[in-house]
Amino acid sequence: APFEEIKKYESLIQGEISYPNYEAVRKSVLSLKNELEKIGVDKKSCHIDLVPENFIEAPDGHLYLIDWEYSSMNDPMWDLAALFLESEFTTDEEDSFLSYYESEQTPVSREKIRIYKILQDIIWSLWTIYKEENGADFGDYGITRYNRAVKELQSQGGIDED
């Protein structure tokens, strides 16, 4: 679950989480749990790692989704949020994709996708701090993901500074 992942990485990080205004952002991010509970979270078989590199086109034109090691029961909107973030879809591209994807059998919640995008950006920003404490160098990856989450939070009513 994403909120547990956030707390897990926070506990693994030895130093300070030095992202700007982190405590206020954290509070706003954790409050998204209430929004998700109101909307409802579906549990279906999901891939969990929908990055472009996991889509392979065979010579015959068939498309294969590989690397199922992280698959689990999760909300399908999590996978769509990951696909949109990791593939850098524009809003128009997201709308186009969803026009093909959505049906009676596969309803879409754009609000859940928005929330899951924020959560994924926060998780990956914390993951980056943890990895960099252990010698990795990801450049501006972590702060870029953090800033994108903050921007999305601000566009939806801001960040509670209290």
Language model segments and positions:
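A glycine-centered beta->alpha junction motif in the catalytic cores
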Residues: 6-19, 122-139
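Active-site activation/catalytic loop segments of kinase-like enzymes and analogous catalytic loops
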Residues: 77-105, 118-136, 148
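Pre-DFG segment of protein kinase catalytic domains
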Residues: 45, 64-67
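ATP/Mg2+ or Mg2+-diphosphate-binding catalytic cores
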Residues: 27, 127-162
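Start-of-helix signal in alpha-solenoid helical-repeat scaffolds, especially tetratricopeptide repeats
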Residues: 111, 115-119
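An alpha-helical support segment within catalytic cores of ATP-dependent transferases
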Residues: 1-48, 59-60
